[in-house]
Amino acid sequence: MPMFEDSEGDGGAVLSFDERRGDDGEAYQSLNGTDGPADENHGREEGGRGRGGGRRGPDGAILRAPRGRGKVQVLPEENSLPPDDPFADDGPGEGRSGGQNRGNRFRGGQQRPAPGGRLPQRGGNGAARGGAMEPGRGPRPGPAAGLRRSPYGGLGFWEKIQSEAALDAARAEFFSGATPMDLQEIQNLSGEQMAELAASLEMDWEPSLRPQLVENCLRRAAEGRTAIAASGTLELLSDGNGCLVWARDRFEPSQWSPFVPRCLIRRHGLRRGQELRLLTTFPRANGPHLCALGLEQVMGQNPGEAAKIPQFKELIPYYPTERLLLENGAEEAGQRLSLRIVDLVSPIGLGQRGLIVAPPRTGKTVLLQAFANAIAAVRPDAQVWILLIDERPEEVTDFRRMARGEVFASTFDETPDRHVRLAEMVIEMARRRVECGQHVVILLDSITRLARAYNAVMPASGRIMSGGIDANALQGPKSFFGSARNIEGGGTLTILATALVETGSRMDDVIFEEFKGTGNMELQLDRDLADRRIYPAINVARSGTRKEELLYHPDELSRIYLFRRAVVGLNSAEAVDMLIQRVKKTSTNVEFLMTLNRG
């Protein structure tokens, strides 16, 4: 057994070093002191592939022998990455996982010290042999709810982005003041323009080489100290940092998603879902990711002005007061008939929180497309978004072709986690725009499937409701749906969501009952009417809007009450059939209401 002296320890104690191999063939060291007790947390490890021993010197540093023969090395106490490689990728998941042994080694084979200077345990949870947790420590907490783990490895520990002063110095070092190169312009170049760019860079051009050509162009700009301007939506990560994402990638981090350090986020009070324009660069010549060092715009405004925007929860909500006359925006005769009846039965205003109760095959898809086209026509200043969750792929294609508005979709062959992340990003983007005084309309299909996705990804609370849904699973969908509101003196967020009923699933019925009283407008579709091929299959008696007097003209309201009293004694089929026949005889709803007193 080779022997060596502890030159860094106390009193020159003699330590013995032995290298052996475990059952899995991996080499491990046994470090034993001839005097003084060994550190109990490093003497034996649970769930490990080997055993190690150690002791501490007079300054409290851990003494550990390297592989092979030699003197004991003193590992640093700092909880940081080595200065020569601050961008090492720790593999999938969060960059600093304290339990994985192989993912916590530096290039030289040394283990990365955990917080407080201790080496991480191979068992993964810091427990000793008896299963007792080390005093004052516990399992590493998981990521914040709704936030993804960082895919950027150790980039967040780069010393040049750890403080505002360091960030200012980094901008002076990496940027020369020349006009920035726009990332989106390079990515959107046509084939001919890409061929010209390839010739200027002395590269061969083929369509399959577009990513390599874009990368070479950006790296040359970075080498010349030219900033790379990138515009996108801010996504926050579980470690407090962020990145830019785009709708074309369904808000998933891509190869060109710039890293946004937490220092920049805190300095300007950035929020998830904000539209940013950043100045970025490659931190090193062969670094895989862009890193943001400067901020030019937030939601199209100066960063200083954007920081004064109040948060969404601080805004004062009120009932909708500005009506959307859908009949004026109808493009087809069939859509016009449906929209005229909706205007009569359950009017919609800016800031409405509406629930469309729809059994299967009752025409909800056609109705949503009609809503999108009409709202886009009557209110061009409103942004119309269509959010499809757990939907069929062909249905997504049909919406993109037939409806006016931006479509965000997550199809049924994707994971529930993807459904939840997409929905949360869309609602955060909508909130940021409402804070700026803009109008946003979200058509959601469906809130039932969104609640199912939340039920699948939420940790089990142990409290199960009827139908198998967790008691905490509906908090996320309620937060989404409850964001719809009319802001006094500001913007509006309108959400019209479909709720599935009569599907044969008890869970779907429970979800509908939970959302039944949360909206201020309800439009019920009738399966019996659809089976008789009576469209629109709207149940007139069970549909309506709260505070409808704020949307109707007083003269119009009295005629609406007269119409309501006339259909009270009729069943659903008779009421809607009579309404359809009377509406078809007139060209506008005003003309229809004027004929009511004539019988």
Regions found by a protein language model. Give the residues of each.
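RNA-contacting regions in translation and RNA-metabolism proteins
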Residues: 157-185, 217, 228-229, 303-306, ...
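Flexible glycine-/small-residue-rich
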Residues: 217, 236-238, 246-248, 280, ...
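N-terminal intrinsically disordered, low-complexity tails of helicases
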Residues: 166-192, 239, 292-298, 307-312
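P-loop NTPase catalytic core
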Residues: 361-363, 369-599
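Residue-level signature of catalytic and energy-coupling elements of molecular machines
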Residues: 194, 213, 242, 261, ...
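P-loop NTP-binding catalytic core
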Residues: 270-272, 281-356
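Extended acidic low-complexity intrinsically disordered segments
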Residues: 1-179, 223
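N-terminal "pre-motor" subdomain/linker immediately upstream of P-loop NTPase catalytic cores
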Residues: 101-106, 111, 134, 196-306
